[in-house]
């Protein structure tokens, strides 16, 4: 029998690049999504840092009253932010080359659009990269599905809401106090606390925190001891070991007696699916709620819904919230409005000349 050996031609430069990009042996997986993710996230991060430190004030409301957001213009870490693009720009695509000068671009808040659009592309590619690495390793795709919740939330406040409101100036500022301002104004204009999708998001985040703490504490309390009393129980675990590291039967028995039997999972896979799904679904709903309120489909309005037999209003908590909303609304962008629409009279008074 004769074997014929044929020398394999060396792969082309492109072929070697493809192999390197898709290799799961790299210390950090790159992937085709990573080819776009890396430059977009690096750009967003670099511009954010520079603008947070040194960007000049931005005319956010388009009324020639610039708002300072950077450290060099008097802010600290708490009050500083990347100020959203000016209302004078609206939803226009506003790259540097569309402005007459860099000074004009900075004055109109160009860095905000640059950061937000690169950031959204980057996190979407990060999600795609999670799926891609899972696919290469033969894993199921649910890591990327879970990450879609924060991606949807970011897209809602940075892109969908500005589109619905007609201007990037209504997007969430990139800073701590700016985020709080966004939340307060959002409540004033959309009554988000009375929106059922926001309520589901609160249940998702707080419930997820509770379930995570419950699960972690139950597992930690039911470890199978492999060490002496003089050593930490954590030292008894060896990475990659085949044996269970905790006694799920003991944990199930404890929790079943603490609450009731069927409140406790007896299937580890069902348990971990629940731990992932609860906060993810909640945040999906919140992102959907923001996206609907972007187009002014707002939270429930139960104002003055309880009256006595004489027709006099009996205030409920809904009326208290409404009063707070009106107070917040008259205070924000105080120089941009002659009079808030919500407080304007339905009918103009007649004037007899």
Curated annotation (Swiss-Prot):
What does the note accompanying the cofactor annotation read?
The D1/D2 heterodimer binds P680, chlorophylls that are the primary electron donor of PSII, and subsequent electron acceptors. It shares a non-heme iron and each subunit binds pheophytin, quinone, additional chlorophylls, carotenoids and lipids. D1 provides most of the ligands for the Mn4-Ca-O5 cluster of the oxygen-evolving complex (OEC). There is also a Cl(-1) ion associated with D1 and D2, which is required for oxygen evolution. The PSII complex binds additional chlorophylls, carotenoids and specific lipids.
Q: Which residues carry this modification: N-acetylthreonine?
A: 2
UniProt PTM comment: Tyr-161 forms a radical intermediate that is referred to as redox-active TyrZ, YZ or Y-Z.
Q: How does it sit in the membrane?
A: Multi-pass membrane protein
GO annotation, cellular component aspect: chloroplast thylakoid membrane; photosystem II
Q: In which compartments does the protein localize?
A: Plastid, Chloroplast thylakoid membrane
Q: Where is this site: Cleavage?
A: 344-345
**Which residues hold Fe cation?**
215, 272
What family does this belong to? Belongs to the reaction center PufL/M/PsbA/D family.
Propeptide ranges are 345-353
Instruction: Please give the coiled-coil regions recorded for this protein.
Output: none
Residues that, per the record, bind chlorophyll a ChlzD1: 118
Q: List membrane-spanning regions.
A: 29-46, 118-133, 142-156, 197-218, 274-288
Q: What is the lineage of its organism?
A: Eukaryota, Viridiplantae, Streptophyta, Embryophyta, Tracheophyta
GO MF assignments: chlorophyll binding; electron transporter, transferring electrons within the cyclic electron transport pathway of photosynthesis activity; iron ion binding; oxidoreductase activity, acting on diphenols and related substances as donors, oxygen as acceptor; oxygen evolving activity
Q: What is this protein called?
A: Photosystem II protein D1
The entry's keywords = Acetylation, Calcium, Chlorophyll, Chloroplast, Chromophore, Electron transport, Herbicide resistance, Iron, Magnesium, Manganese, Membrane, Metal-binding, Oxidoreductase, Phosphoprotein, Photosynthesis, Photosystem II, Plastid, Thylakoid, Transmembrane, Transmembrane helix, Transport
Q: Which residues carry this modification: Phosphothreonine?
A: 2
EC top class named in words: oxidoreductase
Tyrosine radical intermediate, annotated site positions:
161
- Protein function: Photosystem II (PSII) is a light-driven water:plastoquinone oxidoreductase that uses light energy to abstract electrons from H(2)O, generating O(2) and a proton gradient subsequently used for ATP formation. It consists of a core antenna complex that captures photons, and an electron transfer chain that converts photonic excitation into a charge separation. The D1/D2 (PsbA/PsbD) reaction center heterodimer binds P680, the primary electron donor of PSII as well as several subsequent electron acceptors.
Family annotation (HAMAP family): PSII_PsbA_D1
Question: Could you say which EC number(s) this protein's record lists?
Answer: 1.10.3.9
What does the miscellaneous comment read?
2 of the reaction center chlorophylls (ChlD1 and ChlD2) are entirely coordinated by water. Herbicides such as atrazine, BNT, diuron or ioxynil bind in the Q(B) binding site and block subsequent electron transfer.
Q: A GO term (biological process) for this protein?
A: response to herbicide
Annotated positions for site Stabilizes free radical intermediate: 190
